[in-house]
Amino acid sequence: ASPEISISEMRSVCELATLECYYHNTAKLDSEKKVLFWNTSKKLWIEYSGIAKLGVDVSKLDMKVDGTTVTIVMPDAEILECKVDETSLSEESFYSETTGLGSGKVGAKEQTEAFAEAQAQMQTEVENDETLFIQAKDRAKLLLENYVKNIGDAIGVAYEVRWDTP
């Protein structure tokens, strides 16, 4: 059986076409209230690392072969995963400061809120970095084009790859 260009093979190639970005940042949480006559505040900083993975949704990938022309319909890259690496968190990851009588210690509730803030902050940073999406899509294109050309080389056909959007 000679190799042929297959959409299912392209989808598996494309699953590898993700871009991983590592983040290291700090999120801050402020909590202020009045206890009797005193203003109190709690401040919590969380230092965290996280990983964002970008790539192409392979279910939206399509292809048409017309002679030696292969037209690949590929959507824009998107965030496949974006999360704070929980293993990067330790006692030393949390810095707190309390002022005022009755402010109390920073507890699990504040730590959970700070973690959620870190997660949201990282998601926003990734969403606003257009360069990452361009790099992820370009990487997917390169992998798919190499796949098509390798199949062509194996069967003695020089394929021309064209790109389209859904």
Q: Model regions: which residues?
A:
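Domain-level marker for long, solvent-exposed, non-transmembrane regions
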Residues: 1-166
